[in-house]
Amino acid sequence: MKIKIKSLFLTTVMLLMGIHFQSDVYAHADHDKDANVITMADIVIGIQHYATAKDQKHLQAIIDSDSSTADEKIIATAIINIQHQATAGDKQKLQEIIDNTTPTSTVSALATIVHGFSHGISSADKRKLQTIKFKG
């Protein structure tokens, strides 16, 4: 009887440990899903007036990638086109993203920041972008 209880106890502990560690795997399973958003957030943090040539190469890679979403391509294009602020045409497309996505989404947050970009970003926007990079 003692062996059955001990065996049942060990099995239960192992099962609970497996469930616990599996949830950690699932929590980070889609980490790369937001890789483009994280890259763009990192670029926008460093922009002063316009994106550097190096940043533009990274953004162009996002635009050219088949795995990038339409929203990611629009945001990347808007960042490339920034000359002190987003262009009027890009602002219109960014506003469509903002209006059609969940306000708490990283895509919506990034679109909002790029839409409001003017010679740089505010401290509050920088914190939002750093949060996007951290949570990725």
Model-derived segments and their meaning:
Residues 44, 59-63, 76-82, 94-98, ...:
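Fold-core signature of tandem repeat domains
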Residues 65-68, 100-103:
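Solenoid-like repeat scaffolds
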Residues 12-14:
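Short, linear, compositionally biased motifs with a strong N-terminal bias
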Residues 16-24:
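C-terminal segment of classical bacterial N-terminal signal peptides
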Residues 25-65:
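Immediate post-signal-peptide N-terminus of mature secreted/exported proteins
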Residues 1-10:
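Bacterial N-terminal signal peptides that target proteins for export
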